[in-house]
Design a protein with these regions (language model features):
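C-terminal motif of bacterial Sec signal peptides marking the signal peptidase cleavage site
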Residues: 15-18
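N-terminal active-site segment of His-dependent metallophosphoesterases
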Residues: 21-100
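Acidic/histidine-rich helix-loop elements
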Residues: 48-70, 94-96, 130-155, 218-236
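Active-site environment of divalent metal-dependent phosphoester hydrolases
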Residues: 56-57, 94-96, 121-130, 164-167, ...
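Extended active-site neighborhood of metal-dependent phosphoesterases/phosphodiesterases
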Residues: 98-194, 201-202, 267-283, 295-300, ...
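Conserved beta-sheet core of the metallophosphoesterase superfamily
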Residues: 119, 234-303
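Active-site-proximal segments of metal-dependent phosphoesterases and phosphodiesterases across multiple
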Residues: 193, 200-254
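A short C-terminal boundary segment appended to hydrolase-like catalytic domains
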Residues: 290, 297-333
Length: 333
């Protein structure tokens, strides 16, 4: 609790500083083709992961790193790379600010019409009260500002009509039915019940679960002291461990879990009720230099192998992370 209070104080202090920067001029992003990056294999399909981007959208000094990453993705798409999804792990803003959503919109709209760019809602995408608590889930402007980016998402199911916090986006990986299940920060019990019904009634489909808070910076599944527990008020919520027990563990067609929120990169493998190891992955940009420094996570899905190869890559320096927690594989068929 002491750590939480110190972290909350630091966040509120940063918020005050950020408010003083409201007159920042963000560079206008443009797209131009750059050379093919040989990190890609034309015979594979890819999922690209953006972590939490609130530093990119909140500071004009960092925005060029975001723009460079977007342009790199666009260029590889032009070079014929099969990018199936771009996944964003929440915290688009610091405190639900319209200006930051607009920056995110401006930068991601450039490629959203070519590649589904799917985001989940983070704890910083809600409005806080003076105690640093979230007293109204519906305070988030997430749906309002993400809807334009979602025009080409083939949404198969909504928990609530036309709200994007809890949805299923249908798709394919290597000609197999693979869907993205997006869940809100600290999912309510009724949201988990909806997800259970949908996943259980679609056993012919496989799901990648995208939600904001799940692992610690050390790669442990969060049980007690989650930010959902500490911040959400006037609503039910679930801790990551409860989400595992109530939804993920007993549905073998949930392939993996992707989150952000903490640290930089981590992963955990846990056996579900069938004995299959479920990959749980964390990728978060906010604590990196320059708001993210051009880092991205690459998931390579080869046609001729049964495992997804995950690597952490810097799109500006064109180098892989040397940290072994950022490189691993898990089976997808």
């Amino acid at each position: 609790m002491k750590y939480y209070k110190l972290t909350l104080y630091a966040w509120l202090l940063w918020t005050c500083i950020a408010c003083q920067k409201k007159d920042q001029t963000f560079p206008v992003p443009t797209l131009k083709s750059i050379p093919f990056d040989p990190v890609f294999n034309h015979n594979s399909e890819y999922i690209l992961v953006l972590g939490d981007v609130q530093e990119y959208t909140g500071n004009a000094v960092y925005a060029p790193y975001f723009a460079s990453t977007i342009n790199w993705i666009y260029s590889q798409y032009l070079h014929g790379i099969k990018i199936k999804y771009i996944l964003q792990t929440g915290d688009i803003t610091w405190g639900n600010r319209p200006r930051q959503y607009k920056v995110y919109q401006q930068y991601t709209d450039l490629i959203a019409k070519y590649i589904p760019m799917i985001a989940c809602v983070g704890n910083h995408d809600y409005t806080y009260d003076e105690k640093g608590e979230i007293v109204d889930r519906y305070s988030s402007l997430f749906t309002e500002y993400i809807t334009p980016c979602a025009q080409n998402w083939p949404i198969a199911s909504y928990f609530e009509p036309r709200r994007l916090e809890n949805i299923v986006v249908s798709g394919q990986l290597q000609q197999m039915p693979y869907d993205i299940l997006c869940l809100e920060f600290g999912p309510r019990s009724e949201v988990i019940a909806w997800a259970n019904r949908y996943v259980a009634s679609h056993r012919d489909r496989t799901f990648i679960l995208l939600t904001h808070e799940f692992l610690t910076r050390n790669g442990e599944r969060i049980n007690k002291g989650s930010y959902a527990e500490l911040q959400l008020r006037n609503t039910s919520y679930s801790t990551p461990e409860q989400l595992w027990q109530k939804l993920i563990k007993n549905n073998d067609n949930i392939l993996c879990v992707l989150c952000g929120h903490n640290g930089f990169m981590q992963h955990l493998f846990s056996k579900n009720s069938t004995g299959r190891e479920v990959a749980q992955m964390l990728f978060n940009l906010q604590y990196q230099a320059n708001g993210g420094d051009g880092w991205i996570q690459l998931w390579e899905i080869p046609a001729d192998r049964d495992s997804i190869h995950v690597q952490t890559y810097n799109t500006i320096r064109r180098t892989f992370s040397s940290d072994p927690v950022g490189t691993f594989k898990f089976k997808y068929r």
